[in-house]
Design a protein with these regions (language model features):
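Walker A (P-loop) phosphate-binding motif
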Residues: 3-57, 151-152
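Beta-strand-loop-alpha "switch" segments that mediate conformational coupling across diverse proteins
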Residues: 173-184
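Rossmann-fold NAD(P)-dependent oxidoreductase module
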Residues: 38, 42, 98, 217
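Redox- and metal-dependent alpha/beta enzyme cores, enriched for Fe-S-associated oxidoreductases
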Residues: 190, 197-220
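Anion (oxyanion) recognition and catalysis
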Residues: 44, 167, 219
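Phosphate/Mg2+-binding loops and adjacent switch elements
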Residues: 48, 52-168, 175
Length: 220
């Protein structure tokens, strides 16, 4: 695996625009998609048009990104190089690759690894026994590490960040809290505070990799 990774990085194809890759080592639920959208929104706020590249063939993720960052160019294409060309043709000035940490054959200017505090504090085993796609030594490819938490405490996330940062001098490690901020109407777009749910019985449906965390957040 390490030899293949080194070979793929050596042969990596450079994309036609500055490129930021966001991904994780575990199977979903880390918050990489919200982070990718946040980075794209940051670019928009600074007068740049971001292109968000997704590996899929469609589905809900492109819709989510378009809703979160309306001024972004969103392209879903399993061929990221073709996707980058299409994004540039539509006016993109910088590329944000969602779920691209294992995409070693594509070059990037900034490689961001997102680690869930809940996963890092849990099972250490790779698939299929545990949640990990790669061993934690793969964090050596990161230029920045972001430890996210949902129901884990700030102290737990901080401890994970400290542990991951040891021996990786020059690689920043930060923490982020993923929280439900408000309710938003799918059709109306209207917003309501979470307090409207207090004391009420509701049906919660989630199409995310870690639905349990969503249910726990609604209950807090």
């Amino acid at each position: 695996m390490k030899l293949r990774a080194a070979r793929d990085r050596a042969d990596a194809v450079r994309l036609p625009l500055p490129t930021i890759a966001v991904g994780n080592l575990s199977v979903g639920g880390t918050g990489k998609t919200p982070l990718a959208a946040w980075i794209a929104a940051y670019c928009v706020a600074r007068g740049r048009t971001p292109g968000i590249l997704l590996r899929g063939y469609g589905g809900d993720e492109p819709l989510v990104h378009r809703r979160l960052v309306p001024r972004a160019v969103v392209v879903a294409n399993p061929d990221r190089v073709a996707g980058a060309v299409a994004a540039r043709a539509q006016g993109a000035q910088v590329l944000v690759l969602d779920d691209a940490y294992q995409l070693l054959g594509v070059g990037r200017d900034l490689n961001i690894a997102v680690v869930s505090a809940e996963s890092a504090a849990g099972s250490p085993w790779p698939l299929p026994a545990g949640p990990w796609r790669e061993g934690r030594d793969a964090l050596g490819r990161a230029d920045l590490m972001v430890v996210t938490r949902k129901w884990a405490s700030a102290e737990t996330a901080g401890a994970v960040a400290d542990r991951l940062g040891r021996g990786r001098k020059g690689v920043p490690v930060c923490t982020a809290w993923l929280a439900v901020s408000h309710l938003e109407g799918m059709r109306s777009g209207g917003r309501q505070e979470l307090a409207v749910l207090a004391g009420r019985r509701v049906v919660a449906a989630a199409g995310i990799a870690d639905p349990e965390s969503f249910a726990q957040q609604l209950g807090t």
